[in-house]
Design a protein with these regions (language model features):
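Active-site donor-binding acidic/aromatic loop of nucleotide-activated sugar
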Residues: 434-438
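Catalytic-core elements of nucleic-acid end-processing and repair enzymes
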Residues: 445
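N-terminal localization/anchoring segments of enzymes in phospholipid and broader phosphate metabolism
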Residues: 1-363, 367, 371, 411, ...
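Short glycine/threonine-rich loop-to-helix capping motif typified by GTGT followed
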Residues: 391, 417-421
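CN hydrolase (nitrilase-like) catalytic-core segments centered on the catalytic cysteine
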Residues: 419, 428-431
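Structured, soluble regulatory/oligomerization domains located on the cytosolic or IMS-facing side
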Residues: 186, 373-376, 402
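Helical hairpin unit composed of two closely spaced alpha helices linked by a short loop
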Residues: 382-403, 408, 413
Length: 524
């Protein structure tokens, strides 16, 4: 006979329910929604009861509409979405655009970022011999490298050993070993930090190293950790001697600047070893917990001069938030001697930012698509394409390039999954091959171009990564590491299902939903 529940079980359930209801995430969402309802109510009330205000609203909308059309730097998809909003809400949309039409971060942060970039970008010095070697191997790829040098202050490096990781499970032991061996400094930047085995091990090492006198710094995104960390977690880290801050704090105020998130994943040890990729610091990324089947990710370890570039990217972000702090760049950005290269791989780490209007990651992706001669293989968890990317991918397939895109078989966000699948019919018709990773969720952001170059980083194929977030990636030119990436992609394909037109039929309601989602996607 089953025993009845004890009273403490009910108290625990009540405590759990109240903890969820009054959690920071729920309170923030509820307050923001309440403000949104109030704001739209005020707009409609004013338009209904005041002819003068209606006329002013129409005038503002007309001016904002003209300003939007005039903006050459704004993607057509953003313009179309706003134009539809102007038609649906002619009185209110002008004020909405005035408040939230600029997708860049707030002006104070932009100015601090610009000053920090101006201070640290000159310290990102590369190896002229590496650029010359790349030009000798592949002049066209060297032009892409020049673009990154000129518009992202991202030089090319030789003398850097590169290791590719097909899953976070394999990457973690090396990360822990390098952290344990740190002698001077440790920098950690992550979109998500979650309490558990992975972060617990890393945090303990950071605490020990900080106590030993090393310079240990941590940056995490507040929205990414909103439901995962206590609201005062920065104070807890500082109590351990770890310098830390959470980026773009989530406050219950209706503000689309919250869209600008720090999506980077960077770990730098002593300025000479760096890790990056799609792996956040939470247990699902090393398959210690199961959320959406097997979690497939990727990452790279850089040892040598290229790692210094990621230390510079981290410190640029840090400098923007602590402009008055004295930073000893000779100590924090030490010169790194070349190490034995892995198969002669040339390395080019770069960062992308919404502060300027240069969509660096998107332009690099377009370069890769247009340069592909024989094959182009892409891993992405989300496939929300603007017209430029959709056209270039289709054209590459039509001119005979073997274009293969690997997507999740088990989605983490069903609405985004539905939106991603809405692009499949067009791509399939053009000859693009699309695969669904049946074991679970594919979170890797890996590109392989003709076995000539690859990219491993944080950049998804969606509007948020390409236009709104702070991102980073590593371009790899040649060498044995490309063979490792190719083997990983072959492994993904062996357990994936190739999709056909019949897999993409949504019916009338599904197609209408996808159309609506496409209209809303650029605004979110």
């Amino acid at each position: 006979m089953q025993k009845p529940h004890k009273p403490k079980d009910w108290r625990w359930l009540l405590h759990r329910a109240l903890s969820i209801i009054f959690s920071r995430t729920v309170v923030t969402v509820v307050l923001v929604l309440a403000q949104a309802v109030w704001l739209f109510s005020v707009f409609y009330w004013l338009s209904d009861y005041s002819r003068l205000i209606s006329r002013v609203g129409l005038a503002v909308s007309a001016l904002m509409c003209l300003a939007l059309v005039r903006k050459d730097s704004t993607a057509p998809e953003f313009k179309i979405s706003w134009m539809i909003l102007f038609m649906l809400m002619p009185v209110q949309s002008g004020l909405l655009y005035l408040m939230w039409g600029d997708k860049r971060p707030a002006i104070p942060l932009r100015r601090r970022m610009e000053r920090a970039e101006a201070e640290l970008a000159p310290l990102r010095t590369g190896d002229p011999a590496a650029r010359a070697e790349l030009a000798r191997r592949d002049p066209r790829l060297a032009e892409t490298a020049d673009y990154l040098q000129n518009y992202a202050a991202a030089p090319v490096f030789g003398g850097t050993a590169v290791r590719y990781y097909p899953v976070g499970d394999v990457m973690l032991p090396d990360m822990l070993a390098d952290l344990q061996a740190a002698q001077h400094s440790i920098f950690v930047e992550s979109f998500i930090i979650g309490m558990g085995e992975m972060w617990g091990q890393i945090h303990e090492i950071l605490r020990q190293k900080a106590a030993a006198g090393l310079d240990v710094r941590v940056i995490y995104d507040d929205a990414g950790c909103l439901s995962l960390l206590p609201h005062n977690y920065v104070d807890l880290l500082r109590a351990d001697g770890i310098r830390a801050f959470s980026f773009n704090r989530c406050v219950p105020v209706l503000n689309l600047v919250l869209n600008n998130r720090d999506h980077r994943k960077i770990m730098v040890v002593d300025g000479r070893i760096a890790y990056t990729g799609g792996v956040n610091l939470a247990d699902e990324y090393i398959n210690k917990v199961t959320r959406f089947g097997h979690w497939k990710d990727s990452g790279v370890r850089l040892e040598g001069p290229a790692a210094r570039s990621y230390a510079n990217v981290f410190l640029t972000f840090w400098r923007a938030h602590f402009p008055d702090e004295t930073l000893d760049y000779d100590k924090l950005l030490p010169q790194v001697a070349p190490v034995a290269p892995t198969g002669g791989t040339l390395v080019q780490p770069f960062a992308d930012s919404p502060v300027d209007r240069e969509v660096v990651a998107k332009n690099v992706y377009l370069e890769f698509i247009n340069q592909a001669r024989h094959s182009l293989r892409i891993c992405t968890p989300y496939l929300i394409l603007d017209n430029d990317l959709l056209t270039c991918l289709s054209l590459a397939a039509k001119r005979g390039v073997d274009v293969r895109i690997y997507t999740p078989g088990v989605p983490d966000k069903k609405t985004i999954y539905q939106l991603s699948r809405s692009y499949f019919p067009h791509l399939l018709k053009a000859g693009v091959k699309i695969y669904s990773y049946t074991p679970g969720f594919l979170h890797a952001k890996t590109w392989l171009i003709d076995d000539r170059a690859a990219a491993v980083g944080t950049v998804n194929l969606d509007y948020r990564s390409l236009y709104l977030h702070f991102e980073n990636s590593t371009v790899l030119y040649g060498g044995e590491v490309l063979s490792d990436i190719r083997r990983d992609l072959d492994g993904i394909e062996s357990v994936s299902r190739r999709l056909g037109p019949d897999d993409c039929r949504n019916g009338f309601l599904g197609n209408m939903l996808s159309a609506c989602l496409r209209l809303v996607a650029p605004l979110c």
